[in-house]
Curated annotation (Swiss-Prot):
A GO biological-process term: cytoplasmic translation
UniProt lineage: Archaea, Methanobacteriati, Methanobacteriota, Archaeoglobi, Archaeoglobales
Keywords for the protein's UniProt record, in alphabetical order: Ribonucleoprotein, Ribosomal protein, RNA-binding, rRNA-binding
Signal peptide start-end: none
HAMAP family xref list: Ribosomal_uL22_A
Gene Ontology cellular component terms for the protein in this record: cytosolic large ribosomal subunit
UniProt protein name: Large ribosomal subunit protein uL22
Function: This protein binds specifically to 23S rRNA. It makes multiple contacts with different domains of the 23S rRNA in the assembled 50S subunit and ribosome.
InterPro entries (alphabetical): Ribosomal_uL22, Ribosomal_uL22_euk/arc, Ribosomal_uL22_sf
Organism: Archaeoglobus fulgidus (strain ATCC 49558 / DSM 4304 / JCM 9628 / NBRC 100126 / VC-16)
NCBIfam families in the record: PRK04223.1, uL22_arch_euk
Family recorded in the similarity comment: Belongs to the universal ribosomal protein uL22 family.
Entry keyword Ribosomal protein: yes
């Protein structure tokens, strides 16, 4: 089945000074992806990569600002209290970030001066599965897919 053409939610003012990358329908938590995108937005690519690598190694936590109910306090968070280590989502967003960096190099942009101006997570399709149980019952096991898009511009 061919993949549909997906547009970006953000349009840069000057396409020649911007690089884009998208991870389409990845099997990660939408809530975790939203919080990771908020954490890396406004950062340089190198800073964002270091943050995500630290999250995967459980050295730094991602502040959870929207989805924060019953989330424990974490040390090392600046100006916030609740946080988690969303390792799986961080690995997938890190792949998209590396793709963004490769796209910028291909366009001939200065990677050291690129700032992530747009980082967004969107809900994708839901894969519906059912697990058979005893006495003829079935339990739904739905999987929400997530699309992550990143845009960086030279600043």
């Amino acid at each position: 089945m061919p993949m549909a053409r997906v547009n970006y939610a953000y349009k840069p003012e000057d396409e020649t000074k911007a690089a884009k990358a998208m991870g389409y329908e990845m099997p990660i938590s939408f809530k975790h992806a939203v919080e990771i995108c908020r954490a890396i937005r406004g950062k340089k690519i190198e800073e964002a990569r270091k943050l995500l690598e630290d999250v995967v190694e459980m050295k730094r936590a991602i502040p959870f600002k929207r989805h924060k109910k019953k989330v424990a306090h974490r040390r090392g968070l600046e100006k916030w209290y609740a946080g988690r280590y969303p390792q799986k989502a961080a690995k997938y967003v890190l792949k998209v970030l590396r793709n963004l960096e490769a796209n910028a190099e291909y366009k001939g942009l200065d990677v050291e001066n690129l700032v992530i101006v747009h980082a967004q997570a969107q809900k994708g399709r839901v894969i519906e599965r059912y697990m058979p149980r005893a006495f003829g019952r079935a339990t739904p096991r739905f999987q929400q897919l997530t699309t992550v898009e990143l845009v960086a511009e030279v600043r």
